[in-house]
Amino acid sequence: VAKRLLWTLLFLMLASCGPSSSTTPTLDLLPRLAVTPALEAWVASSLTAYREDHGSLEFTVEVLSYEAALEAAESEAVELVVVGWEPPSDWFATPLDVEGIAVVVNPGNPVRNYTLYDLAAIFSGRLRLWDELGWGEGIVQPVIPLAGDEARRRFEDVVMAGESPTGNALLAPSSEAMAAAVAADPNAIGFMSMSYATEDVRGVRVDGVLLGESSLADGRYPLWLEVIATAPQEPTGALRDWLAWVQAQGEGE
């Protein structure tokens, strides 16, 4: 999963070069962009649209954990990282977007609204049976991202108020795994970046607010990540061009 975005984008980049690509720089010489798993889908969507405008990508992309991405930038293994958590204070950093964190349940689950208190009780293990929320007698099965994932950090910051996740929670190593786990278990509930949400799971309301562009824009929806591009030094060349394009898209909305 961690390499899927990289190889997909490399394929698209090389395919766009066509037969006359003899002057194209080798992959080892192209600048490198790193993105964390929580924002992989956001970056993939952005780069797909960027390629439609520009015809090719002149940089490579890889997926790294938050800590690994910062270390790679510090060591100059990558020129730019896209993260959903605060970068070092002395680094170049620029906001790109806001990505919602969707709370998702199995489509067969009829409970469609959860307060922040409900979510804290569920993911801490204090609320263990669905009948406490008015549905059936099943045992609630929380599913959470791995420690260090930005969506998990933000969820714990906003929802958990210092409580630790229950030891009975399943760990999802990727958003794909999160969606698969929730889709497979009628009693499961999890959370993930909105760009990953599929028809196999159902997003629910949080404090009566459904996640969407308007509820993110006006601040009514409480769970979100700020998408930040960062590096020890401001990037140049192709990566700077992409950043300028992303920000221009945001200004036009």
PLM region spans:
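Positively charged n-region of N-terminal signal peptides that target proteins for export
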Residues: 1-4
